[in-house]
Amino acid sequence: VAYCHEMLPVRPGDHIVSMLPLGHVFGMVYDFLYGFSAGAHLYFLTRMPSPKIIAQSFSEIRPRVISCVPLIVEKIIKKDILPRIDNKIGKLLLRMPIVNDKIKADMRKKAMEVFGSNFDEIIIGGAPFNAEVERFLKQIGFPYTIAYGMTECGPIICYEDWTRFKPGSCGKAAPRMEVKILSSDPENIPGEIVCRGPNIMLGYYKNDEATVQVLDKDGWLHTGDLA
């Protein structure tokens, strides 16, 4: 929670839409504790969060920060934004330099409006992001970023501000976190991602056997993920 406030401060009176399951650490931290600890106004969806309901809530509530899984962004962008240019005329206009910039600015404005127009950035995590949608968002300069984490890390491991974020990545090691790839040649040979920091769990509750399988004697958490 402290890191959330460091990377993207939320102020008293700001609005946050809580739509992630609070039984998961991503939802509990980003959709509840993050805003609650800053005195923000939290809005809980009372119906199943379909893309239509979520888009409507964004429009009415105008949240300051949005945290969500990739599927939500993908469905909203594919339904409300991409169809506007996913045709022969749209693709032709995108090849024309001056018109290209105008279309991108217009698409960015419309995409921002769909999500309430008042947010600093959208933090996406929890699953792989659709490459087509990501290319489009980067092309129009939309403020999104993709973070990487897991429950055992409470949950953040990697993050980068959207202005420095590189497409296809999930940010860089968060402050006070150490991250490395167990490989003889990390740039060319995949290896397991391991991390170490003050936010790493102490261990699994009453399950020492499972704990020693993921936490080594030097405090490195073995994520089981490859990079």
Give the ranges of each region predicted by the language model.
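Short, structured coil segments at secondary-structure junctions
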Residues: 38-39, 61, 139-141, 175
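Alpha-helix/helix-capping structural signal
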Residues: 71-74, 127-128, 199
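Conserved AMP-binding/adenylation subdomain of ANL enzymes
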Residues: 2-15, 22-109
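Conserved ATP-binding/catalytic segment of the ANL
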Residues: 187-227
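A structural signal for short hydrophobic beta-strand segments in well-ordered beta-sheet cores
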Residues: 171, 179-181, 225-227
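Phosphate-coordination loops involved in phosphoryl transfer and adenosine-cofactor binding
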Residues: 12-13, 118-119, 190, 217-218
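Gly/Ser/Thr-rich phosphate-binding loop
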Residues: 64-67, 77-165
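Active-site glycine/GP-rich loop and adjacent strand/helix microenvironment
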Residues: 126-128, 132-134, 138-139, 157-161, ...
